[in-house]
Amino acid sequence: MSVENLVEVKNLKEYFNINTGVFTSKPLKAVDDVSFAIRKGETLGLVGESGCGKTTVGRTLLHLYKPTAGEIWFQGKKIETKQDILEYRKKTAMVFQDPYSSLNPRMTVSDIIGEPLDVHKMYADKSEMV
């Protein structure tokens, strides 16, 4: 992984077993061999038609789903152990497509972004958040 990359995903695969009968199943390839890198300061948007795997990529990237195969790197470190995942989740988040279920209109943007920072005690003083 390049040190310049904040996030790097290599050959990510996420397959789900779909029951095709009482005792049979077949794999559904929801994400198949996806690779990308995000440098510090960059923004990435996942765009595609409904059902193409955008949400699955996001959930797998956050380890909400265990990847079938592939590697996820964050700040030069491969995310693989339970401790890695816990530390990684403190520093990452997913914003879902529906802003009404993702963002509370009664909260300021600062409060929305600051809430997880408060929960994880990621700053000593509120002024550090800005």
Sequence positions of predicted segments:
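ABC transporter nucleotide-binding domains
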Residues: 1-130
